[in-house]
Amino acid sequence: MFTDQGPTLCELAVQALSSVERGYDLLAPKFDQTPFRTPDVVLDAVGRALAGLGLYGTGLDLCCGTGAGLRVLREAGVGRAVGVDFSGGMLDVARRGEPTADCVRADALALPFGEVFDLVVSFGAFGHFLPREWPRLFSEVCQVLRPGGQFAFPLPAPMGPGSLGYWAMLGFDGAMRVRNAVWRPPFVMYYRPFRLGDVRRELDRAGFDVALHALSELGERPDGSPRCGLVVATRR
């Protein structure tokens, strides 16, 4: 699952017992060699889809980590790309990989921008926000988008109990809940609650019109539905 250049189990254990910020600072040099990074096939599919959906002058990669989404912004035709993350270590890696982008250290729940972006993307970050934080998060995104601007992110179809991935995700969430019950500081990383119906409702309340685009090149489920969709929320 990990490459030879990835973190050791000992390094992962230290990271998992840290705060979210400190954990990612520690993981940053080897993050791109872990399965936690969004796969290139997903990034490429999103970039191609966005390139056909609009013209974007400025773009923001929300919770950019090591900057994989900054490349997506370029592929979507964004003229000026900005990445924001609260891990200084992750931003250092992002700056080296995308030297033409502006990388800003900030909290996603208190974005230091006005209405300056045409497009906001995010990859693999929503598990770090509890459901009660979604309204504030989506409101922050809405406030940094120009009217008509888009907030886009991939969302895999939910896995059924007959799949290995379903039980792996259930086990991971359970392990994180036990960890946070007995250890401080907490490390928030729960991905199962982020479901389309709830997310669509909160985006609508925050001021977005929501559409779901199939990322067909990522394959289909046995019932013919797409394995992954692209949520595109347009600011009203």
Where are these regions (language model features)?
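Conserved S-adenosyl-L-methionine
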Residues: 208-219
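Core SAM-dependent methyltransferase catalytic element
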Residues: 221-236
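A conserved beta-strand element that flanks and buttresses the S-adenosyl-L-methionine
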Residues: 121
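Acceptor-substrate binding/catalytic loop of class I
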Residues: 182-197
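Class I SAM-dependent methyltransferase SAM/SAH-binding core
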Residues: 60, 66-110
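Conserved class I S-adenosyl-L-methionine
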Residues: 1-54, 152-176
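A short glycine-rich, Lys/Arg-flanked "PGG" loop and its adjoining helix->strand segment in the class I
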Residues: 135-147
